[in-house]
Regions:
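Binding-site signature for planar aromatic cofactors or substrates
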Residues: 2-203
Length: 203
């Protein structure tokens, strides 16, 4: 659906709307410092992947905590924390396709998507070993995203929310587990995706 925009001369309201409208829906050559700063200020991001099978389940996972870093103009990394599933890792292992998305829930509306090729690497991989992630016990590895498309859109229909704080429940859950219990949990819960694709954890 197209947008019909009427801008009246010398009307600051319509001129402002025009500038805002024309600034959205862009495709970028890279992740600029300004865009990287905007990404860092978002409290949640979403990860979308899918298997190759036509009847396979598309997966979308919300992510929080201080787990994401912009490494350079075309590369993003985030910590893969222990969870109840292994969909993202199983999918990128099979076909590499991945999209990250952020929404502005505060401030001016905006949606940013970074699509490309993903891979899960070990925490001691030379490409990420010097990245300053917080120490999250139970991290399964790092997901690297090599961007081939970077774009934004308006986000005019996304509601506003106030950020109250991070949840502690996952960190508390991990703190109550021994190393052996975490290994047993991953062996049981993270071995395969819901479609039967192997997870193959790096740790």
């Amino acid at each position: 659906v197209g947008h019909l925009l009427t801008v009246r001369e010398n009307d600051p309201r319509t001129e402002a709307r025009g500038r805002e409208h024309l600034s959205m829906g862009r495709v970028y050559d890279d992740i600029s410092p300004a865009l990287a700063d905007w990404i860092r200020r978002q409290h949640v991001f979403f990860v979308a992947t899918a298997p190759l099978a036509a009847d396979g389940h598309v997966n979308v996972s919300p992510k929080g905590l201080d787990t994401l870093r912009v490494l350079d103009e075309r590369t993003i990394a985030y910590l893969d924390l222990t969870g109840s599933g292994i969909e993202t890792v199983a999918h990128v292992r099979e076909n590499g396709r991945i999209t990250l998305m952020w929404c502005a829930f505060e401030g001016p509306p905006r949606i940013v998507r970074v699509s490309g090729r993903g891979e899960q690497v070990a925490l001691d991989d030379p490409r990420v070993v010097e990245v300053e992630f917080p120490e999250f016990r139970g991290a399964r590895g790092v997901v690297l995203v090599h961007a081939d498309r970077i774009a934004d859109s308006c986000g005019y229909a996304v509601p506003k929310y106030r950020f109250e704080g991070e949840r502690d429940r996952l960190l508390d859950w991990v703190a109550d587990k021994t190393d052996d219990e975490l290994i047993d949990y991953r062996t049981t819960k993270n071995a395969v995706s819901i479609d039967g694709l192997p997870g193959e954890l790096t740790v």
